Amino acid sequence: TFTTLVTFGGAFFASFPLFYSTSFGGAFYVWMAILLVFVIQAVAYEYRRKPGNVFGEKTFNVFLMINGIAGPLLLGTAVGTLFTGANFTVDRLNLANGAGSGSATVISQWTTPWHGLEALTDVSNVFLGIAVTFLAATLACQYFMNNIDDKTILERARQRMIPAAVCFVLFFVAWLGMLLFADGRAVDAAGRISIEPYKYLHNFIEMPYLAVVLLLGVVAVLWSIGLGWRGRRNAIWFGGAGTVLTVLALLLCAGWNDTAYYPSLADMQSSLTIYNSSSSLFTLKVMSIVSLLIPFVAAYIWYAWRAMNRKPITREEIRGDDHQY
């Protein structure tokens, strides 16, 4: 997950540098909190069973629990701001005003002292964060069912998957309902941004292929839950694929069809769109060429995971001191 987050940030930096500077530079409290919980996860995995560690194994287990809850909760909340908006302003005149002054030029500024943590006060953001947390728990249980060769652990994972999956479905459906009936920010041909009621619902209606992708993703996740409930080991493949399709459809809905993908709550005209925040044409062309390698990278990832998971993990390997992650 941490590697995916870093890749996500790097891709956004290259393609949408203004979003990168605005979100990562303005909402840095929430991004630093996300970074911290993943750092303590890595430290916990490395040292929890090292002989002579001064904190003890239970302390590192608490670190893992913090990461398992706070990590996806904060990530989901941060992603939710792509639809609900954030408190920032953008003033491109600072580029001209700062030219030749010898000082750093800042064109986007955060308007609250909480620097992103205020997203936790929005019900829609929190619902998405909770849904992501329970989805992570559901997929984790499905992964254990598929990759651990132990009947006791398989049954325990199946039993724990069911309540997590039910909670995920409830919170995700509630969040999706709020999204479809929420106001969005639309951009016209002149670049002016205005509020459009039911904007995201209109996006799915006007782009039915996105609605189909979203439906396929949701059905795949629900199918994986049904398979997991019956104790099928292959549930994770449907759950993982369905999650990717669902996230893809939602992110495209946030930015396509003349939609501001990062609305500003402080100044509507500062909202970020694909048109006003993308990188140079040359950079986008280079990234388009490089993106042709994505199918090969995806195939390699599939092959590598398939090779690692070909032999199920045993209880003895889990109890061992060697690296098993």
Place the predicted regions along the sequence by residue:
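Short, highly charged, low-complexity non-transmembrane loops/tails of multi-pass membrane proteins
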Residues: 310-325
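Alpha-helical transmembrane segments of multi-pass membrane proteins predominantly involved
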Residues: 150, 214, 223-227, 279-313
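Membrane helical hairpin/interfacial module
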Residues: 1-47
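Alpha-helical transmembrane segments of polytopic integral membrane proteins
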Residues: 9, 36-43, 76, 134-137, ...
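Long, contiguous internal "core" modules enriched in hydrophobic/ aromatic residues
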Residues: 51-235, 249, 253
